[in-house]
Amino acid sequence: MNDFDTFRHEAKAALRVALQWFLLAVPMGLLCGFLGTLFHLAVEHATELRAAQPWLLFLLPAAGLLITALYKVTKCEGVGTNNVLRAVQSGEPVSILLVPAIFLGTVLTHLCGGSAGREGAALQMGGSIGWNLGTLLRLKDHDRRTATISGMAAFFSALFGTPLAAACFAMMVEDVGLTFTAAFVPAFTSALIAYGCSLAFGIAPTHFALTAPELNVRTALLVILLGVACAAVSRLFCYTLHFMEHTVPKLLPNPWVRVFAGGVLVIGFSYLFGVGRYNGAGMSVIVAAVEQGQALPWDFLCKIFLTALTLACGFKGGEVVPSFFVGATFGCVVGPLLGLPAEFAAAVGLVSIFCGATNALIPSILLGFELFSGAGLELIALGCGICYMLSGHHGLYSSQTFVTNKLRSEYMSHKWRVKVKKAEE
């Protein structure tokens, strides 16, 4: 075979694969975009209803029992984001029943005042749809991995309106230092289509108005200091979530008792800390921190504790938006002490702690670009880099593996990766 024949053969194969993924990405984006928009609206209306009817908080224990029953009926007990990540890593099956289970469970949690996010739920639903669609189409294991990544990206994009960050996050979060770049085009295509669906239904993308300080040596040094502090908070956030996740079930092994007691405790702590401020995702507090420079000194600690308690007791949602809350409020409070504007420090904190908690450096920088329209991107990237480097080889997801070292340009040994995973467990 001469060079021309080789070129022609490779070109035909590439076009065939590109067409295959385009034909899959379009329906994937439409389906995840529609369901993601529906999920966004459901959580939004649940939040508005709870704000208008504060007594709904007292139904949280009953909502917890319903969620536990729902997961038992669908046989999804113990299934979460880690299972979806393992589906990408090793092809572990993900039940399609996870979609209605996490959808309804998250809406009930937000309706009745549980302190949780929504992006973790989006990753689970998108990953479940992608994996099962790939199975239905009888795709090979490596292609089903791409389908799972595309579903995750599409759902994430539909909720936040950040298609570029969504695609890269879905590609990179499973294995730190390893990126399946072949998944970019289908994942980004699905994310763009899902984003378009959300716009068509009137969902505004998540954007913040931000004024960045001048880029100079002094400002860069201050951002470095903030990044160091964010790394410590990121470690605290992840440690608290994992500690509660493993301790609470040992103290209350019965899931029915655990979720009911957890609901009662969340009610009590909500009244102790301030009803409404730490319930739900807390987007209003995030907006106040980033756009108005307003936050209470203890906001980030209260959110860490209530989110860890909510999720450990069996309520559903995600950890991503709580990481935004923790980062924005922490940055808003600490930034002025260092000499940074409160609003800008909140933005740096938001993206940096998300980065440290998820170990997704490039997606975090892209998220900062899309959330803040590129304002202060160099400084935000600097804060992310420092937090990423110092946050350690652990994060929100225990199934996440570290292929490369975060401190040196070297591969991690298999023994160390296993050690890290066992430490998380």
How would you name each of these model-derived features?
Residues 1-425:
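Alpha-helical transmembrane segments and immediately membrane-proximal extracytoplasmic
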